[in-house]
Each structure stands twice: as structure tokens, then as C-alpha cells.
Amino acid sequence: MQQSEEFNKFLVDLRVTDPRDDKKRIQTAKGGLLTDSYVWVLQNSEFCHWRDDQDQRLLWVKGNPGKGKTMLLCGIIDELEATRPQGKLLSYFFCQATDERLNTATAVLRGLIFMLLEQEPSLVSHVKKYDQAGKELFQDVNAWQAMSEIFTNMLHNSKLQGVYLLIDALDECSTDLKQLLHLIAETSRSTSAKWLVSSRNWLQIKEQLRTVAQRLSLEVNASSVSTAVDSYIMSKVLYLSKLKNYGDDTASKVRQYLSSNADGTFLWVALVCQELENTHRRKALQKIESFPPGLDAFYERMIQQINGEEDAELYRQILGLVATTYRPLSLTESTTLIEECHDLANDPESLRDIISIYGSFLTIHKDTIYFIHQSAKDFLLNKAYTAFDQILPSGIAYQHHIIFLRSLDVLSRTLRRNVYELRAPGSFIEDILLPDPDPLGPIKYSYIY
């Protein structure tokens, strides 16, 4: 395959996401990457041992939800990008359980290979099967077998000597995690690739990486994490002080409350500060003291707060929908699948406003709705909490049934012959100029799923 239109078509077929864009999205959603929140790891003995010793080829960063694993990996990626020797490649992938494009082992390999080929196109010689199979090579029932074979062969190429491979949130790989862990373990033994992976403290991951991985526990390094969280708190309070014009006394008390209750959890600090952004400075101290320590306690408090709002029922429907669908929805897709949002079909900005007001569970990036963090979805779907019955009163299966019925309704009302008004039925899809607005945009989830 030549470096040409043919190669570019191959990349288009291979691409499930561009991990570089995912990294930018994640950092933007979290308010930017603060150097002081990750710099400690660059002097950590386990990390330095992994980076500097060619015989240490797998490092597992593990920790509880909200401890800053993802931003830690973002910082490590930036450091490796800046310091790696010329010619040494780096590839990474961010798993996301709420998006089926980012939560399978095959998607992980497609993302890693995509980045490697972007840097070293000659590696395409390992993908000869594509010439016969086309894009089905990456999508059919044997996709994992094909991709893992291609990937393993690539790692034996001399141009990938000591390549850095990083995967964030292995616990959010919902499909074929066992096979992915086996591949990581095997290639860390049989090739020179240097793996760095992160996850929660899951027994399954511990068991499969036990014999090959060096561990960097965020709980064991609690003092370093706590210091990083304190730096993060200082940054957030400084921002709030400028935004809300806090006096010195208010800023000091806010900082003290955050430091006393954060328990080394970046996410808790971020969520509390997000609430303070929408609170008048006069009520800042009263507001902050209403937030209990701990993520689940915080989420419980926010559910109670939502229940007292005018649009509570609508927001609960939105949460139930987003918690159930197989991928993140756009604003326009959401308006077609929520009964109370049908009147917002031509006004998705109103839905954006509603979600923004109650932002402790959801966030919006480029008109797509995401959970603020996987722990937020876990909380809502945990039947031990009342939130589950509030957003899914009839259960998950019934919610899928409702989505199915609404999809049938919107498809029957929208689809018609030649909806794009093509002049020639034999037009290539690349030649079709989408109308604005796209009549199929709001029903994309419905016609795919």
C-alpha cells in the first residue's frame, strides 16, 4: 500500500477515534491540565524505574475513582512527548465506558495502531489483510483476532523499539477486557514495548497483570496525591476568587473546607467548585458547608437538590436516557428521545441551558452530552441508592423499551423517499452535500440502534 489516497482511505477505515482529540476534550472538560497536579509522579521511584529500565516494560497505575488517574496520564503523555528520543514512537488511548466506540478491546487497538501509522506510515506493511477484506477487517466478528495479530507483528518491527504505549481507564473497557489484558501481559514479555496503563483497583486486572506489572498505587502514594490535590485547590480557589470577587476571609474558609474534606480526591474538589461558580459570593460559605465529603455523598446531595427544582422531572428523564444509551447523545438526538423535550426539537440550546444548570452529573462538549465522570454514572445505576429509582422508576429494560418506541415514532415521522433530494440515485456518499440542518441528524441514534 502506497502513501497515497489508498493509504488515506485505509486510515479513514481504521479510525474509530483520534486519541489526540480525546485527550484535548478530556483536558478541556476538566478545566485544563495543571502541572502541579501530576509533577510528583515524574520523581516517583516506580515511574522512573519503568521509564529508565529497559527490562521494566509494564507499569500499572491504580487508584480509586476521582483520584486523578486520567489527568496523571495526560501529564505523563506530555512529559514523554517532550523528552523521548528522536524516532521513539508514542501511542495512547482513553477508554470510556459510556461510549461503545471507546469501550472495546478492538477499539483500543485501532486507536493505538492509528496513532502509530500516523507517525510511521511504513508500518502499514503489517496490514496486508486489508487489501482483501477492506474496512470489514476492523469490524466483523473476527476483528479482535485480526487486530491483535497485526498489532503484535507491528511491535516486533525495529521501528517500534521501546515504543511507549499508554491506556487510560482499563476498567472502562467493557468488551473483551480479558483478551486485552492478556495481550498487554504477553507483549510486555515478548517485545521491547513499554506499557503504562491505569485503572481502578479491580481484582480482575490485578490477577492478569500480577506476574508482569510493576504497580504505582495512588493510595500508597497518598501523601503525594494529597499535596497535588492541595495545589489543585489553591488553583481553583484563586479562580473562584477572581470570578466571584471573594474577600480574603471567604477565600481562606473555602480553601480550608476543601482541604479538610477532599480526602485526596480531585473530582470532589472539582464538583464542589463547579457548584460554587453558580453561587452568589454572599452564600458561598453556607453553600460549601452543605457538601459532605465523599463522591457518593456528594452525588446524593445533588440528587436531593435537583428534586427541589422546577425542571426536576425533565432532568431525571435526561439522566435516565443518558445512563441507558449505548453512546453519548447529541443535544438534537436527545430532544427526539425524551417526551418532554419534543417541543425543544428546534431549540436544542434550551436543553443545553437545563443541563448546564444541573451540571454535577452531565457536561456538554461540542453539542454532545457526557457524564462528568464514570463514577457519576455508577452512582445513578447503583440500586443501593434512591437515585436509581428516581431516574429509572421502571428499570433499565423498560427504559430501553421506551427508547425503542420513541425511535420508531421519530423514524416514521422523519424518513421519506430521497430525504436528501439527490438528483442521481447512484451518487457516491463522498459527493453528497449534507443539507443544513441535516434532517437525519436528530434521528441518528435511532436508525443505528
Model-flagged regions — what are they?
Residues 1-412, 416-437:
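Conserved NB-ARC/NACHT P-loop NTPase core of NLR-like innate immune receptors
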Residues 436-449:
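Amphipathic alpha-helices of TPR/Sel1-like and other helical repeat/solenoid scaffolds
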